[in-house]
């Protein structure tokens, strides 16, 4: 009985981490940034909320398109891009980490 319980808990714990949110952003070199999102299990981030935050305030918000992408005008100064797929499934990328 104990072995079955431990095995069941291990299966449940592994499935809880089966789909971590992932995102990559790159500078297009034309004054815009493109961010691509998804999940570690290969599922789409289409429709997932995306935010640009600057100085602790949301300056842009939208949802990932059907290709799990968002392209936006590059803000002046430091900012961070946030993929918000719900509690425990957020990804934060600082502007200094976005390269061309």
Predicted features along the sequence, with ranges:
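Sec-dependent N-terminal signal peptides
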Residues: 5-13
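Beta-strand-rich domain onsets/edges
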Residues: 17-33, 54-56, 95-100
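Short solvent-exposed capping/turn motifs at the termini of beta-strands
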Residues: 37-41
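Short beta-strand/loop motifs in extracellular/secreted proteins, especially
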Residues: 46-48, 79
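Short amphipathic beta-strand segments in non-cytosolic proteins
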Residues: 49-61
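Glycine-centered loop-to-beta-strand initiation motif
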Residues: 63-72
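Periplasmic N-terminal soluble interaction domains immediately after the signal peptide in Gram-negative
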Residues: 70, 76-79, 95-98
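Short, aromatic- and glycine-rich surface loops/edge beta-strands on solvent-exposed regions
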Residues: 77-89
């Amino acid at each position: 009985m104990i072995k079955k319980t431990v095995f069941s808990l291990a299966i449940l714990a592994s499935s809880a981490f089966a789909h971590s949110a992932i995102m990559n952003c790159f500078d297009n070199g034309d004054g815009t940034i493109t961010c691509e999102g998804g999940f570690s299990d290969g599922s789409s981030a289409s429709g997932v909320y995306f935010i640009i935050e600057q100085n602790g305030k949301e300056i842009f918000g939208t949802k990932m398109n059907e290709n799990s992408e968002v392209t936006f005008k590059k803000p002046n100064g430091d900012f961070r891009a946030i993929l918000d797929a719900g509690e425990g499934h957020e990804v934060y990328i600082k502007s200094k980490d976005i390269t061309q």
